[in-house]
Amino acid sequence: MLAPLLLLLLAVPLWQAAELRLGLRGSPRGTVSPAFLSLTLDASLAREPRFITLLSNPKLHTLARGLSPGFLRFGGTSTDFLIFDPHKDSTLEEKILSELQADFSQPGFAAVQELLLAQWPGQEKLLLTEHSRKKHKNTTITGHTLDILHGFANCSGFHLVFGLNALLRRHGREWDSSNAGQLLGYCARRGYNLSWELGNEPNSFKKKSGIYIDGSQLGRDFIHLRRLLSQHPLYRHAKLYGPDVGQPRKHTQRLLRSSAAADSAEQKHYFYADHLSSPNLTSRLFLPLPHDTAQIVAATVPGKKVWLGETSSAYGGGAPQLSNTYLAGFMWLDKLGLAARQGIDVVMRQVFFGAGSYHLVDASFEPLPDYWLSLLYKRLVGTRVLEASVAGADARRLRVYLHCTNPQHPKYREGDVTLFALNLYNVSQSLQLPKQLWSKQVDQYLLLPHGKESILSRRVQLNGRLLQMVDKETLPTLHEAALAPGSALGLPAFSYGFYVIRNAKAIACI
């Protein structure tokens, strides 16, 4: 089913070396949040709450810490089917984990996790089947569920954004906040510093549950939630994010106007395709991100930021044999570049770990190509966005983006810039730096697929070295390859990589 995609990539002409045009002298094009690349956990992970305990795995903590700081959004369709019951008994697995953690005996939980991992494929199949059939059931979560979620986020260097159930209604209209009040009370008593959302994709409520809620009503519900938060000193100034929409609808403006006093950022959910690797995927691989949401927000509530609150290569769990391969990295890296260029403040990757094919970490806690790509992005790319373009090549097939280098990186200094580039040609391409940079040292971080599967590989190498964890608590060193001053930047066919230009003296980066 991927054949049309591969044919599209191959059917391109040979072009000569491209000349880079880099905006080093002016002001930055824009600035994004330090948490620009953030993560999600789908609420379906709590569909059977005992599987939440998988988040206690130390290897998963190590992998998450590598991508911090950021937001960790716990949301998705299942958000609106979660019921909090402070009196319900926790699952056996949650109780065991709690007791072992109290005794500082984390290794003792390993046997329980092995059993859960053996049962996970069946649970994953159930979740994907329910999603495809649009059959959603209420799930009860307990205080232990919240403890594990908050503990995972906190220990990994992330700020948890928790989605509250918006489908609890009085007479099908006004939001019933009683359950949310219980959940907020529990979190406040535990001292959990969280941010909040209300509902997931309200534009699809009718399809999911048969309940239609117009934008004005949902806006009033946001105001209601803000008042509820204000009853707790800990949450008086907590961030409330939303609304998050799958597609802009006519009621979006009404919702924004009604909730303007409550929300901190409007969220857009964006995927390139559905979960099937259909021929239509070829024409949708590199579509520009939609401007309509940003335009609506700017016109309705100026100053509010826009997030991509849930995004990946394909919705519905991802596209099998695509979303978890090197090939998906083209879509992910390009989306990061486009989003920053278009002023999106935060991009939340669906998902870090969970059901489907679009996760960054698989069911064996092994990092996939998009994880390593995300790790490099976090290490090398800063928040200031600069201008970049190419001359002498088709910009749709040779894509370049430029940022100030991450100032937290120990090897780099103010004035350094990070270029990341994607080559969709079937031949190698060379990028020529502007003449004023020919004397500068450039560090290359070239990502290529590893193994005979080529671009459909689930393993990746950096500058020729296979990327893999040293052990469950240690990420590998990301070794650069220093290029000789004046060298062209080489990109093999169907590849992507990062290039740090040292001492570029970019004015916006000083």
For the regions a language model picked out, list residue spans one by one.
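Substrate-binding/catalytic cleft of secreted carbohydrate-active enzymes
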Residues: 207-213, 268-290
